[in-house]
Amino acid sequence: MPTTFQEIPRERPVTPLLDRADTPAGLRRLAEADLETLADELRQDLLYTVGQTGGHFGAGLGVIELTIALHYVFDTPDDRLVWDVGHQAYPHKILTGRRDRMLSLRQKDGIAAFPRRSESEYDTFGVGHSSTSISAALGMAIAARLQNDPRKSIAVIGDGALTAGMAFEALNHAQEVDANMLVILNDNDMSISRNVGGLSNYLAKILSSRTYASMREGSKKVLSRLPGAWEIARRTEEYAKGMLVPGTLFEELGWNYIGPIDGHDLPTLIATLRNMRDLKGPQFLHVVTKKGKGFAPAEVDPIGYHAITKLEPADKPVAPKKPSGPKYSAVFGQWLCDMAAADNRLVGITPAMKEGSDLVDFSERYPERYFDVAIAEQHAVTFAAGMACEGAKPVVAIYSTFLQRAYDQLIHDVAVQDLDVLFAIDRAGLVGEDGPTHAGAYDLSYLRCIPGMLVMTPSDENELRKMLSTGHHYKGPAAVRYPRGTGPNAPISGDLEPLEIGKGVVRRQGGKVALLVFGVQLTEALQVAEQIDATVVDMRFVKPLDEALVLEMAAGHELLVTIEENAIMGGAGAAVGEFLAREGVVKPLLHLGLPDIYVEHAKPAQMLAECGLDAAGIEASVKARMAKLGL
């Protein structure tokens, strides 16, 4: 196995067993004794594939053995296998007939980064966000019961995803309806238990066996006739198991808990899964794995190797790096530290995105004011609301796509009470290879309809810093949405002064057309304006809208064009149109933004071009409308 990133193979490794087992039917024809070798081959093939394409890395390496065991024991796709989030599903894709397409992973018109129902019958449920698998598998299990179908439903969920309330809602419901399903906890952070070894594996085999289950049920029937005897026996059993396994919580929720077992021990996995396959009711298997298993750098640094970029060809000349600005998330991280130094009321909150949202420095400099609430977006928002009630100034750093999960809390717990909570909304707009489940396509639409909400869209790095300060000083809920990646390298001022609320800026004065830009498409709009002699306005604020400036532009131009990287329906452009309609102003309007589709995964530049939001697309759309109007 390679020991460094550069040693990842650039040519497909020789894999004679995997060549025969790239479908579950082929896998089941292998002897059980061959599966260890198959796991080695699959791990090498995964390293090769992701090395060529880039993508999620560590989680897949950690579930090689579990994936093999699941498809070996269960009759997939008839038995329903649901992966939570989907970061770990690359080995599943390789083993379910898509190996020959893996080099198109996360590329335009290629296979998706996550399980997709439209891609394969083995992808029983589309995922991307966390903590949905148990609910989905439970729904499938109950549907199977209603159809008198004996198929099994299996959910595979990580220990991080299990922190979300939705997962526990499903666990609680499953025992109430006595669902015939299996939940597998993929514990790859060892945050729940380190109790793994020969004794634990042996105990798991015993507790999951049909003999044990039948003896347990028989004893229950006998002892239930004796007053108090069954309760004593039950507590004795729980005490004995509790000394060896940490399953009390799940047992109390009504699940038959087995484990923890070593998730890289194929014989134990297969024996345990075979036993549990035949058990009725809600079954819970705790499997401990190592993220990045088999690739030393990923084992040492599972966060850094959660995902990787693709390998460059060995003979590719090193091109000089083009100067670029800092990432927008880095600008936010620096502002957070600066404002924290100036205002000791500031606290930073994130739902498990410390690295992605660039809160690492803040967490180290202000540990007592930093709160990672885990994958719990609803809790994050109401937690912030509670702190705001007591005079704190919470900043919730959250991805646009994940804020959708806390919309009720945003309205009910923050906005209705007019609390001072600032939402730093990262990954707004199109995010690229992760596709539609991760796109921040709707935040302007769902934020601007909330009374009292301040909504801002920076056009560059300096504007982001100023808007964050504006939101921090605002009395009430505020949101700043900014994209993934770097900006145009605008000079950044070091001050913390706010902007004048609700005021846009004319960046270029032109002729008959005015381009009203909400966000980072300002750079492209300025390029287009040079070709068609247009006025360009950096609108800055979606709410409150600079109504005076909109009226001025309408009076002085023959066509208004709104530009935003958000859904056209209900977005910033719609706000302009609604305002003009209220004022009785009739003016030709062209709205450019994200169409009413789910934009499929591709490179960000390809996605913008597909939506007509690159410079060429904007210019073509404006010229077409100008021609139609005779301008």
UniProtKB/Swiss-Prot annotation:
> Pathway membership of this protein?
Metabolic intermediate biosynthesis; 1-deoxy-D-xylulose 5-phosphate biosynthesis; 1-deoxy-D-xylulose 5-phosphate from D-glyceraldehyde 3-phosphate and pyruvate: step 1/1
One Pfam family cited in the UniProt record for this chain: DXP_synthase_N
A Gene Ontology BP annotation from the UniProt entry = 1-deoxy-D-xylulose 5-phosphate biosynthetic process
Q: Which SMART domains match?
A: Transket_pyr
What does the record's cofactor remark say about binding? Binds 1 Mg(2+) ion per subunit. Binds 1 thiamine pyrophosphate per subunit.
Cofactor(s) required for function per UniProt: Mg(2+); thiamine diphosphate
Sorted keywords for this record are: Isoprene biosynthesis, Magnesium, Metal-binding, Thiamine biosynthesis, Thiamine pyrophosphate, Transferase
Residues bound to thiamine diphosphate are 87, 128-130, 160-161, 188, 295, 377
Role this protein plays:
Catalyzes the acyloin condensation reaction between C atoms 2 and 3 of pyruvate and glyceraldehyde 3-phosphate to yield 1-deoxy-D-xylulose-5-phosphate (DXP).
Q: Which family does it belong to?
A: Belongs to the transketolase family. DXPS subfamily.
Q: What is this protein called?
A: 1-deoxy-D-xylulose-5-phosphate synthase
* Source species of the chain: Pseudomonas entomophila (strain L48)
